[in-house]
Amino acid sequence: MPDPCCIDKCECKEGGCKAGCKCTSCRCTPCEKCSSGCKCTTKEDCCKTCTKPCSCCP
């Protein structure tokens, strides 16, 4: 069963999705660690490209 925060909408917090919310349709901005630690422009790219994506790149 999906997390309640992902059923109707994405809930963003600084650094990515709200804690516990791992929704593929979420379009939160990458966190500082992601944007500074890898060259990916989106967390989706980070997840696919980087070997060790941070927690906001599910």
Swiss-Prot record:
Signal peptide range equals: none
Keyword Metal-binding on entry? yes
Q: What does this protein do?
A: Metallothioneins have a high content of cysteine residues that bind various heavy metals. Class I MTS in marine crustacea are involved in the sequestration of elevated levels of heavy-metal ions.
Where does this protein hold a divalent metal cation 3?
12, 17, 26, 28
User: RNA-binding as a keyword?
Assistant: no
Binding-site list for a divalent metal cation 4: 31, 34, 50, 54
Q: Which SUPFAM superfamilies match?
A: Metallothionein (SSF57868)
Inducing or repressing factors = By cadmium.
> What is the protein name stated in its UniProt record?
Metallothionein
Domain of life of the organism encoding this protein? Eukaryota
What are the boundaries of the region Beta?
1-29
Q: Which family does it belong to?
A: Belongs to the metallothionein superfamily. Type 3 family.
Binding sites annotated in the UniProt record for a divalent metal cation 6 = 40, 46, 50, 57
GO MF annotation terms: metal ion binding
Q: Give the residues the record marks as binding a divalent metal cation 5.
A: 34, 38, 56-57
Binding-site residues, a divalent metal cation 1: 5-6, 17, 21
- Keywords from the named record: Cadmium, Metal-binding, Metal-thiolate cluster
**Which parts of the sequence are annotated with region: Alpha?**
30-58
Name the residues that bind a divalent metal cation 2: 6, 10, 23, 26
